[in-house]
């Protein structure tokens, strides 16, 4: 039986502002497909990205490049959860499996604003997935990323087994003489880290939200933002922690519910908007319609709710 060549999908997009509204140019190759873009509040280009192959197998590669011009605003999401199929032990020629790889490169110019919000990544048993996210931006630009991964199809009683998930996030601020690091975040989950109390402790869902803010945050702003994020954990299950960056915020979720991770990150997302005087985000049309993560949540820049006592 003839083996199929792995996919290498590429997507390169440029965003420019015209009369207060951001437009995109560029294109992609299979298995990527761009859906119709919406114009959100403040002229933001909201663009869903579709992976038409129905899932990723060992050896597949995805490359995404996003370039934002001055004053442009964009929200990039995916149409559905991304599946990564098992690789380890599936081939006699390659019993150790082959890694599926995804690289995302984001380059932001002055006062631009990018929100990278893909839907959930689901690793099947024995899947190998490695991702890199590289961001460069000036001090007056904003970058927000929220990513959620489920390690094994737990509803079917499946675990990750011999699979592994690797992630490398690097954010650099453009400097007058040389760039400076905002964040370098390298993670690997698999083997003992899945059940170790210093790892996931048996939780199958992990998520990270990172915000590189477009301005230095005062001590009061950081205090209010962190207090609000902790308050937003109320009614949700899992271990949720957050802390400040030099100029921004990082939040982590570990638990059993991708829904609760999505709800918490959506509420923090709304707070980052409010802090900049922007409107509350509209949930992308391709996200689950039955969910309303922002319902009943106050998102004001000067609110100081009581922090949750759990987790």
UniProtKB/Swiss-Prot annotation:
The transmembrane segments are none
Q: Which GO terms describe its cellular component?
A: cytoplasm
The listed locations are: Cytoplasm
> Predominant location of this chain?
cytoplasm
Query: Which parts form a coiled-coil structure per UniProt?
Result: none
Q: Which InterPro entries match?
A: UreD
A single GO molecular function term of this UniProt record:
nickel cation binding
**Family indicated by similarity:** Belongs to the UreD family.
The record describes its quaternary structure and partners as: UreD, UreF and UreG form a complex that acts as a GTP-hydrolysis-dependent molecular chaperone, activating the urease apoprotein by helping to assemble the nickel containing metallocenter of UreC. The UreE protein probably delivers the nickel.
Instruction: Give the function comment from the record.
Output: Required for maturation of urease via the functional incorporation of the urease nickel metallocenter.
Q: What is the name of this protein?
A: Urease accessory protein UreD
Annotated source species: Parasynechococcus marenigrum (strain WH8102)
């Amino acid at each position: 039986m003839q083996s199929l060549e792995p996919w290498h999908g590429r997507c390169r997009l440029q965003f420019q502002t015209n009369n207060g509204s951001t437009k995109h140019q560029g294109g992609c190759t299979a298995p990527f497909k761009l859906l119709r873009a919406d114009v959100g509040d403040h002229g933001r280009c909201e663009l869903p990205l579709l992976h038409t192959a129905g899932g990723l197998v060992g050896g597949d590669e995805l490359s995404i490049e996003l370039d934002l011009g001055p004053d442009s605003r964009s929200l990039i999401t995916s149409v559905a959860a991304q599946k990564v199929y098992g690789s380890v032990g599936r081939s006699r020629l390659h019993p150790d499996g082959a890694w599926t790889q995804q690289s995302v490169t984001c380059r932001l110019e002055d006062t631009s604003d990018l929100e990278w919000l893909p839907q959930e990544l689901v690793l099947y048993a024995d899947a190998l997935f490695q991702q890199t996210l590289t961001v460069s931006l000036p001090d007056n630009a904003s970058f927000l990323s929220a990513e959620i991964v489920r390690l094994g199809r737990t509803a079917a009683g499946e675990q990750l087994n011999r699979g592994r998930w690797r992630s490398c996030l690097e954010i650099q601020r453009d400097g007058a003489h040389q760039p400076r690091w905002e964040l370098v975040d390298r993670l690997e989950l698999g083997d003992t880290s899945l059940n170790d109390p210093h790892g996931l402790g048996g939780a199958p869902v992990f998520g990270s939200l990172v915000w590189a803010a477009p301005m230095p945050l005062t001590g009061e702003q950081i205090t209010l933002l962190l207090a609000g994020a902790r308050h937003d954990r109320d009614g949700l299950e899992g271990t949720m922690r957050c802390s400040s960056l030099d100029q921004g915020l990082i939040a982590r979720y570990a638990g059993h519910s991708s829904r609760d991770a999505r709800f918490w990150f959506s509420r923090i997302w709304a707070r980052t908007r409010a802090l900049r005087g922007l409107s509350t985000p509209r949930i992308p049309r391709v996200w689950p319609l039955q969910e309303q993560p922002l319902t009943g949540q106050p998102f004001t820049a000067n609110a100081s709710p009581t922090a949750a006592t759990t987790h």
